[in-house]
């Protein structure tokens, strides 16, 4: 049974990933900073298999201890604070600090960064640039970094579909998913 830390595990993709990994018997730790419904996260696996973990910053000694004792670190946290839109701090600097912690760990962990669709340094998007810089940093600092560039992801429980549902109800057309 591997121990896996998933940053961003309370999100849409994270919940589906946790369900899949818990079916395979892995222990999941979900660090979070903001308010999260811990009970819903705990119920994604059997009792004690999924552990929500509140931390204040990446410099938190308890978080560093958790990262030192885990097999795999997955970062799904490549979204941004919608109010501030400060991509450099919320994406790049977070990943930079996380990579530095993993590199200084006694056992170098498998690091998986969930990147973004169409990420490119040549784009005018500050988010795209921040994610691209994070990818470069991961490859430069860690030998076993994996970057996953997803396509468009929608599904049950997704905010996108919830917002479209009223339009579908009043429309003659029904999308087939």
Language-model segments: which ranges?
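Conserved Rossmann-fold NAD(P)-dependent oxidoreductase catalytic core, especially the SDR/UDP-sugar
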Residues: 79, 93-141, 145-151
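The conserved SAM/SAH-binding core of class I Rossmann-like methyltransferase domains
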Residues: 31, 76, 148
């Amino acid at each position: 049974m591997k121990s896996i830390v998933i940053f961003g595990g309370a999100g849409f993709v994270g919940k589906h990933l946790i369900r899949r990994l818990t079916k395979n018997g892995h222990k999941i730790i979900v660090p979070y900073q903001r308010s999260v419904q811990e009970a819903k996260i705990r119920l994604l696996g059997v009792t004690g298999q999924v552990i929500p973990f509140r931390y204040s910053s990446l410099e938190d000694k308890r978080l560093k201890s958790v990262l030192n004792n885990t097999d795999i670190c997955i970062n799904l946290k490549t979204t941004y604070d919608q109010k501030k839109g400060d991509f450099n701090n919320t994406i790049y600097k977070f990943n930079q600090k996380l990579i530095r912690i993993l590199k200084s760990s006694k056992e170098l962990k498998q690091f998986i960064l969930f990147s973004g669709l169409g990420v490119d340094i040549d784009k005018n998007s500050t988010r795209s640039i921040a994610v691209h810089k994070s990818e470069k940093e991961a490859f430069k600092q860690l030998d076993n970094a994996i970057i996953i560039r997803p396509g468009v992801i929608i599904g049950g429980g997704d905010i996108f579909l919830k917002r479209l549902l009223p339009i579908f109800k009043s429309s003659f057309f029904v999308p087939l998913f």
